Amino acid sequence: MTPSNTLQKLRKYLEGRTGKAIIDYNMIEDGDTVLVCVSGGKDSYTLLAMLMALQQRAPVKFRLIAMNLDQKQPGFPADILPRYFESIGIEYRIVEADTYSVVKEKIPEGKTTCSLCSRLRRGIIYRTAKELGANKIALGHHRDDMVHTLFLNLLFGGKLKAMPPKLVTDDKSHVVIRPLAYCAEADIAKFARGMEFPIIPCNLCGSQDNLQRQKIREMMQEWDKRYPGRTESVFTAMQNVVPSHLADADLFDFRGLTLDTPVDEGDIAFDAPEMPISGMIPISQTA
C-alpha cells in the first residue's frame, strides 16, 4: 500500500526532528554501532523507522541492530517482532529472559512492579549491547516523556531533573541516546497508526502506568487543551536554563557573588515577569 501524502509529510517532518536532535546532541558518529531497543510499542517502532531512514542518507556510516527483550510475560506474542524485523531487513537480536517470574516472586501482589522490572531490563540491555559490540543504545522516549519526567521530579521528588537526550551508563561502557527527543507523542501516534505497525500491548504484565506519571500526563493534556503549546514551551525551557536565577549553590556561586559578578539576564529583582499572552485564556473565562 502506498502511503498517503499526509503520512509522507508526517514521516518527513519526524525524520527532520529526529535528525536535528541527533545533530544537536551529537548522538550518532561515524563507525557507531547502535542497539535500537524495540518493545513493540508505537514509540520504539517509530524510532527504528526514523533511524533506518536517516541511515540511508546520513553523512556518517553507522550500524543498526534492533533488539527485543522477551520477558516471558503471559500472552506475549513472541512471533510478531522477529517477523517484522525480517520483513524490513534489519539485523536483530531477540533476547529471552524470564524477568516476569523474578518480579512476581520478589514483589508482593498489589505492589507496583515497574521499578524492579526496569532495573532487570536495563541490565540485560547493557549486557546485550556489550555482547554485540554496540557502543550506543537508542531508546524511544520522546519530548512528552521528557517533560512528564521533569514534572514528576519537580512535584514528587523535589528535584529540577528530567530525562536527558543523551547520557553515559553507570559502568561507562555505553552512551544511551533518545533520538525522538524533539518529537511530540501525538505526531508519533499518528505516524504509527498510518504505518499500521503491529503494536504489542504494553500492559501484558497486568501493571498499569505509574499513578503519579498518569496524573502528570492528564495535567499536561489539560494544560495543552486550555493553553495550546504548553508542553513545547516547557521543553524549550529545559533547553534554556539560567542557574543564576534559580537557587542551587552548586550551579551558581551565590556565596561568592560580588558587584563584579556577571549575571545572566541582568537585574530583574523588582520586575514582574513579562509573559506572552498568545493562546492564554483569561482567568475570568476559566472560573
From Swiss-Prot:
<keyword id="KW-0411">Iron-sulfur</keyword>
<comment type="pathway">
    <text>tRNA modification.</text>
</comment>
<keyword id="KW-0808">Transferase</keyword>
<keyword id="KW-0963">Cytoplasm</keyword>
<keyword id="KW-0547">Nucleotide-binding</keyword>
<feature type="binding site">
    <location>
        <position position="205"/>
    </location>
    <ligand>
        <name>[4Fe-4S] cluster</name>
    </ligand>
</feature>
<keyword id="KW-0460">Magnesium</keyword>
<dbReference type="InterPro" id="IPR012089">
    <property type="entry name" value="tRNA_Cyd_32_2_STrfase"/>
</dbReference>
<keyword id="KW-0067">ATP-binding</keyword>
<keyword id="KW-0004">4Fe-4S</keyword>
<dbReference type="GO" id="GO:0034227">
    <property type="term" value="P:tRNA thio-modification"/>
</dbReference>
<dbReference type="GO" id="GO:0005737">
    <property type="term" value="C:cytoplasm"/>
</dbReference>
<keyword id="KW-0820">tRNA-binding</keyword>
<feature type="binding site">
    <location>
        <position position="114"/>
    </location>
    <ligand>
        <name>[4Fe-4S] cluster</name>
    </ligand>
</feature>
<feature type="short sequence motif" description="PP-loop motif">
    <location>
        <begin position="39"/>
        <end position="44"/>
    </location>
</feature>
<comment type="similarity">
    <text>Belongs to the TtcA family.</text>
</comment>
<keyword id="KW-0408">Iron</keyword>
<keyword id="KW-0479">Metal-binding</keyword>
<keyword id="KW-0694">RNA-binding</keyword>
<dbReference type="InterPro" id="IPR014729">
    <property type="entry name" value="Rossmann-like_a/b/a_fold"/>
</dbReference>
<comment type="function">
    <text>Catalyzes the ATP-dependent 2-thiolation of cytidine in position 32 of tRNA, to form 2-thiocytidine (s(2)C32). The sulfur atoms are provided by the cysteine/cysteine desulfurase (IscS) system.</text>
</comment>
<feature type="binding site">
    <location>
        <position position="117"/>
    </location>
    <ligand>
        <name>[4Fe-4S] cluster</name>
    </ligand>
</feature>
<dbReference type="GO" id="GO:0000287">
    <property type="term" value="F:magnesium ion binding"/>
</dbReference>
<dbReference type="InterPro" id="IPR011063">
    <property type="entry name" value="TilS/TtcA_N"/>
</dbReference>
<dbReference type="GO" id="GO:0000049">
    <property type="term" value="F:tRNA binding"/>
</dbReference>
<comment type="subunit">
    <text>Homodimer.</text>
</comment>
<dbReference type="GO" id="GO:0016783">
    <property type="term" value="F:sulfurtransferase activity"/>
</dbReference>
<protein>
    <recommendedName>
        <fullName>tRNA-cytidine(32) 2-sulfurtransferase</fullName>
        <ecNumber>2.8.1.-</ecNumber>
    </recommendedName>
</protein>
<keyword id="KW-0819">tRNA processing</keyword>
<dbReference type="GO" id="GO:0005524">
    <property type="term" value="F:ATP binding"/>
</dbReference>
<dbReference type="Pfam" id="PF01171">
    <property type="entry name" value="ATP_bind_3"/>
</dbReference>
<dbReference type="InterPro" id="IPR035107">
    <property type="entry name" value="tRNA_thiolation_TtcA_Ctu1"/>
</dbReference>
<dbReference type="GO" id="GO:0051539">
    <property type="term" value="F:4 iron, 4 sulfur cluster binding"/>
</dbReference>
